């Protein structure tokens, strides 16, 4: 059984409010306006495992919360059930009182956290696109 591909026209609209930069991350260390959640492994977050990219220091952004993206995924690659996702976020003290932004090593797996957050909260996720690949250069 093959699916028929139907041509369509899609107009993408850029929304810069869903992306933050390094300056905003640094400001947040002081003003704590949003929770910054890191999708990397716990060992990388804690600086116990070297970064795969040469030239990056180990560690994490001050005041950020570690939530390895793998915790949200079943063995078959699907997301865990909504109630499980909520429980995991709650266990990590990620709440709805503050806005959220997500980062990872390169800006890719942070979107897994962002989508999971969107599923459980109905809010659009905000991503630090530079992620640790940018932040870890300092």
Task: Describe these PLM feature segments.
Residues 1-35, 39-138:
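Rhodanese-like catalytic fold shared by cysteine-dependent sulfurtransferases
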């Amino acid at each position: 059984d093959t699916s028929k591909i139907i041509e369509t026209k899609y107009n993408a609209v850029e929304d810069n409010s869903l992306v933050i930069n390094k300056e905003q991350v640094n400001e947040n260390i002081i003003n704590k306006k949003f929770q910054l959640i890191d999708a990397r492994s716990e060992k990388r977050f804690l600086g116990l495992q070297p970064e795969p990219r040469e030239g990056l220091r180990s560690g994490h952004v001050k005041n950020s919360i570690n939530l390895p993206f793998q915790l949200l995924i079943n063995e078959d690659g699907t997301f865990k059930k909504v109630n499980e996702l909520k429980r995991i976020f709650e266990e990590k003290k990620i709440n709805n009182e503050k806005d959220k932004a997500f980062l990872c090593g390169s800006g890719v797996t942070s979107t897994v956290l962002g989508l999971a957050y969107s599923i459980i909260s109905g809010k659009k996720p905000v991503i630090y696109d530079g992620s640790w690949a940018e932040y870890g250069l300092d």
